From Swiss-Prot:
GO terms for molecular function: structural constituent of ribosome. It comes from Shewanella oneidensis (strain ATCC 700550 / JCM 31522 / CIP 106686 / LMG 19005 / NCIMB 14063 / MR-1). One of its GO terms (cellular component) is cytosolic large ribosomal subunit. It comes from the Bacteria. This is Large ribosomal subunit protein uL29. SUPFAM superfamilies: Ribosomal protein L29 (L29p). HAMAP family: Ribosomal_uL29.
Length: 63
């Protein structure tokens, strides 16, 4: 997801997005641990999306 799309969302929507990404990250970590995950780059993408959402939440809280 692009940062410009995230900036248009409200803080509540961003928190919901963050929760979904954290759940997805957990599921991917479990799949990776059991050897079921073949596309390991998904972990990196989800981690970066979490960072994007957290950054925008912080910037909106300070504004």
């Amino acid at each position: 997801m692009k940062a410009s799309e995230l900036r248009e969302k409200s803080v509540e929507e961003l928190n919901a997005e963050l929760l979904g990404l954290l759940r997805e990250q957990f599921n991917l970590r479990m799949q990776h641990a059991t050897g079921q995950l073949t596309q390991t780059h998904q972990l990196k993408l989800v981690r970066r999306n979490i960072a994007r959402v957290k950054t925008i939440i912080t910037s909106k809280a300070g504004a």
